[in-house]
Amino acid sequence: MPSYVTRQKTRQTFSWVGRPLPNRKQFYQMYKEICMKINGCSEIHIKVGQFVLIQGEDNQKPYVAKLIELFENGSEVPPKKYARVQWFVRFCEIPIPKRHLLGRRPSAQEIFWYDCSDCDNDIHVETIIGPVQVVALAPEDEIPVNQKSEETLFVKLSWNKKNFAPLPPEELAALRRLECQKPLEAKTKSVKSPSWSTAEQEVKRIESSHSTSRSYQDPAHTVTPNAMKSLECGGFTRKPNMRLSRKILCDSLDSQKTCKRRAAFSETTSPPKKPQPGEIKTSSALETLGKNGHTQPFFAKSSMVLRTRGTAVKTTKLTVESALSPVRSRSRYSVAPSVGLTPQYIGRKAKEQETHKEPIHTSLRARRRSSLLTLKRIKQQLWLLDDDKSDQEEEESISSVEVSDSSSEEEDESVPSPPTGKPVGQSRTRRTASKPSSQTPSKSPKKTFRPRPPLHATPQIRDRNLAVQEPASVLEEARLRLHVSAVPDSLPCREQEFQDIYSFVESKLLDGTGGCMYISGVPGTGKTATVHEVIRCLQQAAQTNDVPPFEYVEVNGMKLTEPHQVYVQILQKLTGQKATANHAAELLAKQFCSRGSQKETTVLLVDELDLLWTHKQDVLYNLFDWPTHKGARLVVLTIANTMDLPERIMMNRVASRLGLTRMSFQPYSHSQLKQILVSRLKHLKAFEDDAVQLVARKVAALSGDARRCLDICRRATEICEVSHQRGDSQCLVTVAHLMEAIDEMFSSSYITAIKNSSVLEQSFLRAIIAEFRRSGLEEATFQQIYSQHVALCRMEGLPYPTMSETMAVCSRLGSCRILLVEPSRNDLLLRVRLNVSQNDVLYALKEE
């Protein structure tokens, strides 16, 4: 879509047209038409039933709606102007998970009838940007692609938040009746801008001077006697210093851009002249004079020549066509060359015979720009052609244009003309006709074209070549079921918490309001799993119309590099766009805090909330503040491990916005852990009953962490499988296997490292403890410890090591982080400390 008026800082004023139609029941005054004045220059009359553009979050893609009513609320002081609309939605406004339901690639100009009544249909009149043309099509029709329909929108389907459907017959008929009415331009009354009127006065002054003044001949151009005679009768005359200033010309060009482009290349009365090989033609028109005397704006992107029709003057029959060609000033210090209008005279006979022609030299930069524009348009046309053979012909024409970009004839003929009812084959015939007829066939084989990659490739995960292997044994099946990521059929022992969270979110969805809930509990108590189960059940209920549809977004504080990145993650998952943290926070605040901006409720799950804490606590404040706004459809579910997190680290203004809706997940008891294990191992005999009872009681006494319990059982199956392969036990997890797994799980890594250390390393640790007890300090030098080490070796009858060997032992224990040592350059004065308690060292060194 092109840029709209909202990008320019325009001043719009609105006024009613006609008499009001009072509504005594609602104290409203209804109107049928409103006048919108832009910058005091142009007036646009908009009636009920027309389609309008409405200001939105993105200026490039404003909202589209149909006017249903125009009214003024008399109860307000001062009275405000309102409009009731029927919304349309663009494809980018549809939630990302549901865009695949369309089943095809949408057009950039396609919109959808919004068939849902849960949004606010009353808007302020000041938010209207202007009218827009909307064309209704049948579902099987194709959207036309041409220059004339750039600012036209097309509607084929409707969207009801669940799927796409064809337009209702009555709505389709109503939309097509609107198309048969008076076109949009007839309702727009434009006031001439000063710049354009100045240009018109200048042209009229030039016309009036033809009959009285002598024609001035430019030395660069030659005029035949016939042309001179015609000029004396009433043709255009050029005076020496008569030039339109660059400012007047640019202002006239800018004022024309606001009007709709109606003219086309086919509007010229005479056939286009064919340039000679050495001539470069840059064709355009500033204005085309019709038979009625009115000016019609006409632009082309690569335009430079200004033409007028021969039928512009009624009173005089001219035999000479006048063309205004630009004359660039040769000023050396000007930033941009000023353009003057020079009448250029071309006789009809000379035009038909193509004998009197003057080459117009253009700069290399302008030629390069025109060539690139030609290539761009040809490539766009190539994508629209489905025939492979025609594609190859177009690519050959592209290569010919690239080689000879200095020839403007090929550029002019290669540009696809605007739609004038001619088939595509005619333009292809013209291009092939311009080539020499006698060509020697190339002996070398044609260049083979590589297959093009798809225009819009969809990234996807690679398919699995081999099927997933089935578990080979009972123990392997048990390990799969006991994995933390395995989703069980149900969540036992959390029925009450599930019901409370479900009721809270369901009530907010039904009421269309926002809220916040704080969920706390120690790790492994099922907080995240319970919330996921609630969301899954609510999504199933939304598919059966039991609850309104909603959008679900989940962020985890552990996956963020910085707390403010939570804004970026939320915005990307909601809209699919990327932005900086500050800009994303502004967009989210505008979406959640403005009334009527949301059409669906958003459920936001924030896991590991305590990791989003900052010094100013602005992230937590915004997350808790957004649901409190009036009309904000945002439900925030926060999860943290600390029960008193709001009172301990949050400010009062942040904790107050959190609300009183809190829930605490208590640690699992031994009976609950046993029930969880039994439900996972349902119909699978892999554990002894006593083993399950033992691991449940052990874990419940320590932490009540269900994840730790599942990990211990999985490790026990691995130990059992290894012992079964050696033939030591049967394929059943016993109490001994579980005790071994529990010892591995709950024992410290430092204790395990000390137990597995060498005799010399264990002797050095005993020497450290002996020196600490002797000195009464928790720190000693390497020289003092070495003396104790030598004494202990003599008492035990062991050969004592050298100083270098003892230094190597100390460095190894320091690398294992069992000791805290200084750099070895201190040598004998190296200070040594224990990184674990003395009791743990003595426990690891005791003889069993």
From Swiss-Prot:
Basic and acidic residues compositional bias, start-end: 349-360
Compositional bias segments (type: Acidic residues): 388-397
Gene: Orc1
Gene3D superfamilies reported in the protein's UniProt record: 2.30.30.490, P-loop containing nucleotide triphosphate hydrolases
Residues the UniProt record annotates as site (Histone H4K20me2 binding): E93
Ranges of compositional bias, category Low complexity: 434-443
Modified sites of kind Phosphoserine: S193, S252, S270, S284, S325, S404, S407
PTM text: Phosphorylated during mitosis.
Entry annotated with the keyword Phosphoprotein: yes
Start-end of Polar residues biased regions: 191-200
One Pfam family hit: AAA
Assigned GO CC terms: chromosome, telomeric region; nuclear origin of replication recognition complex; origin recognition complex
Organism of this sequence: Rattus norvegicus (Rat)
UniProt keyword Phosphoprotein present: yes
Name recorded for this polypeptide: Origin recognition complex subunit 1
Family indicated by similarity: Belongs to the ORC1 family.
Any GO MF annotation of the entry: metal ion binding
InterPro entries: AAA+_ATPase, AAA_lid_10, ATPase_AAA_core, BAH_dom, BAH_sf, Cdc6_C, ORC1/CDC6, P-loop_NTPase
Binding, Mg(2+): D607, E608
Origin superkingdom: Eukaryota
Span list, region Disordered: 189-227, 261-280, 344-365, 388-466
Positions of the BAH domain: 44-170
